[in-house]
Amino acid sequence: LLPEKCRRMLPSILDGSFIERAENLLTFGLPGRGKTHYLAAIGYEMILQHKYNVLFISTFKLVQKLLIAKQALELEKQLKKYDQFDVIIIDDIGYVQHSREEMEVLFTFLAERYERKSLMISSNLVFSEWDKIFKNPMTTMAAIDRLVHHSIILEFNNDSVREQEAMKALKK
């Protein structure tokens, strides 16, 4: 089951107005809590109900694409390609422990979308642990500041969905 706040907020999220306002949707919680599923389902509804252009991408894949573009001196061009999407879902931002170059392109991407286009992000790390992502305290604070400025923040503090399913399977 979804945490109470996530259930309560769902109707207002599904109306899509947060995308019109270039707001972000940030989900936090331990692995297996349903964050990715929640964001993917919202993204699917944004496509079906509102005809928004939505991209779902893992943090690792996003960073790799940005790095390749930077090395080819085409980072600006790659960032403009992402502008075609009304909202981009970035999955598992905390899993990738970034090098300085990776951190820089990820920060550039986040800063580029700030107040212009929406992001939906899942993370296993709370903000106090984001120094593991960005390494530099100032960059960490700047990234968090931009993301939370216009955001809906949801904590998935429920039991593990995978654990619940495993327990049900054992009982059969």
Regions found by a protein language model. Give the residues of each.
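Hydrophobic positions on the alpha1 helix immediately C-terminal to the Walker A/P-loop
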Residues: 38, 42
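Post-Walker A helix-loop "phosphate-sensing" segment adjacent to the P-loop in P-loop NTPases
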Residues: 43-57
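Hydrophobic anchor at the beta1->P-loop junction of P-loop NTPases
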Residues: 27-29
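Phosphate-binding P-loop
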Residues: 14-22
